């Protein structure tokens, strides 16, 4: 009986947190996180203020939990796909990343949007940068002075891709998006090295 009650409570807590997350994502489309009040959020999702305070001390606390959970899922994707040159681990990592974003599409879209959290965007950048440095080094063993520019190009391209997909790509599956992003990165790598070597021959 006690275990059953616990499961029921857990389910209710999950439902409440999910409603708050959705409500926050919707409000963040209109205004910055600093302007959103607890009253506004609980009214939007039809939950008591006391229920909100049972789980969070304030709006930034709620946002921090949401961001941390997403980051943990992305970190897990990184751990599960260590770089293995010659294998498609990079592709599977990208696919997992898109799955995490897809499962959190509303809030992820709000976070990278105009009223989003620049701190979250930076964390996402760091995560992608670590992985892209690792994967590019695996794809292209020699280090050159141009690599930092190439990292920057790939990183910003990936971030732009993610933003566009979150905002407009509801009908495109994470697999489809991952395939497309992967093709773009690989073709950039290939083109970068082909033209570089081509020029040196002339």
Put a short name on every predicted segment:
Residues 37-38, 66-75:
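Short, basic, alpha-helical segments at the C-terminal edge of helix-turn-helix-like DNA-binding modules
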Residues 2-31:
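Basic, helix-initiating cap at the start of DNA-binding domains
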Residues 74, 78, 128, 132-135, ...:
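Terminal, non-globular segments
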Residues 79-107:
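Hydrophobic alpha-helical connector segments
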Residues 27-61:
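Helix-turn-helix
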Residues 23, 55, 65:
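Residues in the recognition helix of alpha-helical DNA-binding motifs
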Residues 156, 164-202:
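C-terminal peripheral helix-coil segments that are non-catalytic and often amphipathic
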Residues 115-140, 145-160, 186, 190:
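Amphipathic alpha-helical packing segments from all-alpha helical-bundle domains
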């Amino acid at each position: 009986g006690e275990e059953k009650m616990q499961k029921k409570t857990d389910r209710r807590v999950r439902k409440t947190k999910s409603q708050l997350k959705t409500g926050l994502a919707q409000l963040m489309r209109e205004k910055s996180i600093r302007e959103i009040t607890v009253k506004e959020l609980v009214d939007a999702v039809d939950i008591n203020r006391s229920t909100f305070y049972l789980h969070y001390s304030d709006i930034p606390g709620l946002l921090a939990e949401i961001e941390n959970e997403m980051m943990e899922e992305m970190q897990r994707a990184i751990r599960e796909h260590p770089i293995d040159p010659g294998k498609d681990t990079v592709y599977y990592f990208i696919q997992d990343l898109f799955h995490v974003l897809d499962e959190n599409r509303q809030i992820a879209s709000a976070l990278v949007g105009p009223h989003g959290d620049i701190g979250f965007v930076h964390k996402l950048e760091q995560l992608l940068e670590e992985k892209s440095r690792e994967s590019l080094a695996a794809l292209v063993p020699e280090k050159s002075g141009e690599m930092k520019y190439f990292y920057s190009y790939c990183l910003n391209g990936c971030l732009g891709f993610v933003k566009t997909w979150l905002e407009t790509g509801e009908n495109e599956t994470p697999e489809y998006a991952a395939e497309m992003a992967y093709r773009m990165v690989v073709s950039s790598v290939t083109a970068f090295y082909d033209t570089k070597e081509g020029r040196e021959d002339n």
